[in-house]
Amino acid sequence: MRVSVPVLALAFGSLAAAAPNAGRRTCGSVPPPEFFEASEKVAALEESGAFADLQAPIEVETYFHVVASSRSERDGYISDQMLSDQIRVMNEDYAPHGVHFNLRETTRTINPSWASDGNEIAMKRSLRKGGYAALNVYFLKDLGGALGYCYFPTNAAPGSTTFIRDGCSVLSSSVPGGSGAPYDLGKTATHEVGHWMGLFHTFQGGCSGQGDYVSDTPPQRSPSSGCPVGRDSCPGGGVDPIHNYMDYSVDSCMNQFTRGQGTRMSSMWRQFRAGK
């Protein structure tokens, strides 16, 4: 796996990014040690049944921020219909696991620097809405080759830099109807929000160790490319989860989270975000 490590990724509440390269996604995600430890503890609590009575539906207060360099779609000024289709895709993808995104407001900003992912903290300090349980998605024209990135949940003090930068940045051309084929069906937002909800990539850890700390996702040596049906990169553990939203298949190949991932999202939500 080729890893590009942004400076921001070295802090807790780490960056998780996906970038297209030669027709496939690559990863610049560097989950911090604290999040591995938190995932291991949450997995143990799930195994013990400690979260069994906490699997109620999750309603996520959601804000969309369109940040473009001009009022042209090619410069990132995506339409209301595209945004409506994006929230619909997210809700369809998460509905089987009791998660619903309630789009409260959409903001639109013309700022060429911000639209190219410049001055991230200044942008988010200006635009961010809600508490730590609120999902802020920033649709940007250019992410330096990336499709998107998100921050993992942590214990963030209100008003801190970790709190301000929380949320997801998504390439505007990846929304439904965008120009970013084969990543133009809205699955980038689904994938990135999975990190915001506390999920690793399915290929985390390769064929050994704890992997993604979710027991029902088969081990996977490396990210998928395209839609390689029948791929089995870790013999003995089952075929690779190429249809999982947390792999790197093309959008048309993605169609599921596992039951265990749904449980993990619920557990992480209640551990880090609920009521905050």
UniProtKB/Swiss-Prot annotation:
Binding site for Zn(2+): 191, 195
One Pfam family this sequence matches: Peptidase_M43
Induction: Peaks of expression occur during the endosporulation stage.
Active site, renumbered: 192
Segments passing through the bilayer: none
Gene Ontology cellular component list: extracellular region
Family annotation (InterPro entries): MetalloPept_cat_dom_sf, Peptidase_M43
UniProt-annotated stretches for the region Disordered: 211-233
A biological process from GO: symbiont-mediated evasion of recognition by host pattern recognition receptor
UniProt-listed SUPFAM superfamilies: Metalloproteases ('zincins'), catalytic domain
Any coiled-coil regions, as ranges: none
Keywords: Disulfide bond, Hydrolase, Metal-binding, Metalloprotease, Protease, Secreted, Signal, Virulence, Zinc
Keyword Acetylation (UniProt): no
Signal peptide: 1-18
Record has Zinc as a keyword: yes
Family: Belongs to the peptidase M43B family.
Function per UniProt: Secreted metalloproteinase that allows assimilation of proteinaceous substrates. Pays a pivotal role as a pathogenicity determinant during infections and contributes to the ability of the pathogen to persist within the mammalian host. Digests an immunodominant cell surface antigen (SOWgp) and prevents host recognition of endospores during the phase of development when these fungal cells are most vulnerable to phagocytic cell defenses.
Protein's name according to its UniProt entry: Extracellular metalloprotease 1
Source species of the chain: Coccidioides posadasii (strain C735) (Valley fever fungus)
Gene: MEP1
